[in-house]
UniProtKB/Swiss-Prot annotation:
Its EC number is 4.1.1.49. Its main location: cytoplasm. It catalyses: oxaloacetate + ATP = phosphoenolpyruvate + ADP + CO2. Mn(2+) binds at residues 185, 204, 241. It is found in: Cytoplasm. Belongs to the phosphoenolpyruvate carboxykinase (ATP) family. Monomer. Binds 1 Mn(2+) ion per subunit. This is Phosphoenolpyruvate carboxykinase (ATP). It comes from Shewanella baltica (strain OS223). The lineage of its organism: Bacteria, Pseudomonadati, Pseudomonadota, Gammaproteobacteria, Alteromonadales. Pathway: Carbohydrate biosynthesis; gluconeogenesis. One of its GO terms (molecular function) is ATP binding. Substrate binds at residues 45, 179, 185, 305. ATP binds at residues 185, 204, 220-228, 269, 305, 431.
Length: 513
């Protein structure tokens, strides 16, 4: 894309990008100063349109299938060239950014976008380095052309839009998509492929650190509480979604947060609330006539979002890094109402539940989801983003846990007293009290009760939590019905886990069907 043929804005500031977005009709300002943009029909990720170029350098290391769909190298070259030609006479926005807040494990990336608000999103979510690419690594390229219309017959895509990763050429192509989350998740997938070869575990998790330097990780799918629980006024945020765990410490892969906004309240989520101001991008958030965001309005999508830089959070770890974690929390949203609010896991149970990734899609981030809430097993708590076989990541997790001695907990942010529609969801204050007990060390070496069917150890008391909530059978009026649902869930775990080749110790660490 030659600079002389179009107007190219290099490393534009936040204020410039907001001005461009408003002048070009890409969005509107809200009363709190944020820029709100709409993404149209695709208000979430499009997993059916995501591909990886099948080429010799990476072919043998990728787990090909419905998640990692193969794309022909020649077809990619043709489509990349067509998109470049399409953008040749367009006004463009370009930034040199980095992915990975670690001096050894970062990846430099040049992001070219057709929309100003997409560039603002990229500058909020990726890292703006003081000095770009200090180690002179080969630079990745992202091109995002949302107004380009793909032709499946001509381009080899599945629809009029696509996301394609090319590891050999270090290129990411996004075409026909306005949903900005595709940009951040594409580079997350890149790091998820590259980091294991460097002995680093990439993780779909949030992370924070206490005043004494103790790090806690929160794994979970979108909507299970990663962002909410890591944004703790008593602790310092490292990041809310993507991290690497290397020998010696953890680091944020990003430079910002991408928080779900549905039902956001100042009372329950003050850190996120205060971060939404000038420079923040709001996706698909509805405003009233006074331009005040209505976070309860899901008329455009359940998957409303706020994208803001970490600088918008007062209590944050400024280097985006932390020590190795003392506590690791697996967040599961159990729609059956069977799992306890907190369980203490052995390292074998940690491997079992990491591979299982049992949870729910809560206001799914994927387009085409027919139900707002549905149970799912998502390997590594992020199956759509991990190109390598699941065992690679599970082995790295076990290695890191054993090496450092981290304690792993399973925390249910879903339902109790009955399944979704009958029981009630654990409220945020209850889950926060549980997390407080975890990070304080209160739950180490405590008295527990064993739930035989689920094969889980549950503490008999947690400060600030009604003890009746801790054993889920106590919250069900019909105890026999609870036992029936628990057995069904155990059978679902066993059926899902049958595909994994693991040791007997790990297999036997799961529920007992």
């Amino acid at each position: 894309m030659a600079d002389g043929l179009n107007r190219v804005h290099f490393n534009p500031s936040t204020a410039q990008l907001v001005e461009f977005a408003l002048l070009r009709g890409e969005g509107e300002l809200t009363a709190n100063g944020a820029l709100v943009a709409k993404t149209g029909a695709r208000s979430g990720r499009s997993p059916g349109d995501r591909f990886i170029v099948r080429e010799p350098s990476s072919e043998a290391e990728i787990e090909w299938g419905p998640v990692n769909q193969a794309f022909d190298p020649g077809a990619f070259e043709g489509l990349w060239a067509r998109v470049e030609a399409y953008l040749a006479d367009k006004e463009l926005f370009v930034s040199d950014l980095e992915v990975g807040a670690d001096t050894e494990h970062y990846q430099p990336v040049r992001v070219t976008t057709q929309y100003a608000w997409h560039q603002l999103f990229a500058r909020n979510l990726f890292i703006i380095p003081e000095e770009f690419n200090r180690k002179d690594k080969p630079v990745w390229q992202i091109i995002n052309a949302p107004d380009f219309v793909c032709d499946p017959a001509r381009d080899g895509t599945n629809s009029d839009a696509t996301v394609i990763l090319n590891f050999a050429e270090r290129k990411v192509l996004l075409a026909g998509l306005k949903y900005a989350g595709e940009m951040k998740k594409s580079m997350f997938s890149v790091q998820n492929f590259l980091l294991p070869a460097q002995g680093v575990l990439p993780m779909h998790c949030s992370a924070n650190v206490g005043k004494d330097g103790d790090t806690t990780l929160f794994f979970g799918l979108s909507g299970t509480g990663k962002t909410t629980l890591s944004a703790d006024p008593k602790r310092f945020l490292i990041g809310d979604d993507e991290h690497g765990w290397a020998p010696g410490g953890v680091f944020n892969i990003e430079g910002g947060c991408y928080a779900k906004c549905i039902d956001l309240s100042q009372k329950n989520e003050p850190v996120i609330w205060d971060a939404i101001r000038f420079g923040t991008v709001l996706e698909n958030v509805v405003m009233d006539k006074h331009r005040v965001p209505n976070y309860k309005d899901s008329s455009l999508t359940e998957n409303t979002r706020a994208a803001y830089p970490l600088e918008h959070i007062a209590q944050r770890k400024e280097d985006n890094c932390g020590a190795e974690p003392h506590a690791v929390v697996f967040l599961t949203c159990d729609v059956s109402g069977v799992l306890p609010p907190v369980s203490i896991l052995t390292k074998e149970q940690a491997a079992y539940h990491f591979l299982s990734g049992y949870t729910a899609k809560v206001g799914s981030t994927e387009i085409g989801s027919t139900s707002a809430i549905q149970s799912t097993f998502s390997t590594c708590f992020g199956a759509p983003f991990f190109p390598r076989p699941a065992g690679v990541y599970a082995e790295l997790l076990m290695k890191r846990i054993e090496s450092f001695g981290s304690q792993v907990y399973l925390v249910n942010t879903g339902w109790t007293g009955g399944p979704h529609g009958v029981g009630k969801r654990f409220d945020i204050p209850t889950t926060r009290a549980i997390v407080d007990a975890i990070v304080s060390g209160e739950l180490k070496d405590v008295e527990t009760v064993h739930l035989d069917t689920l094969n889980l150890a549950v503490p008999v008391a947690v400060s600030g939590v009604d003890s009746n909530l801790l054993n889920p059978i106590n919250t069900w009026g019909d105890k026999a019905l609870y036992a029936e649902y628990a057995q069904k869930l155990a059978e679902a775990f066993t059926k899902n886990f049958a595909k994994y080749q693991v040791s007997d110790a790990i297999r036997n660490a799961g529920p007992k069907a």
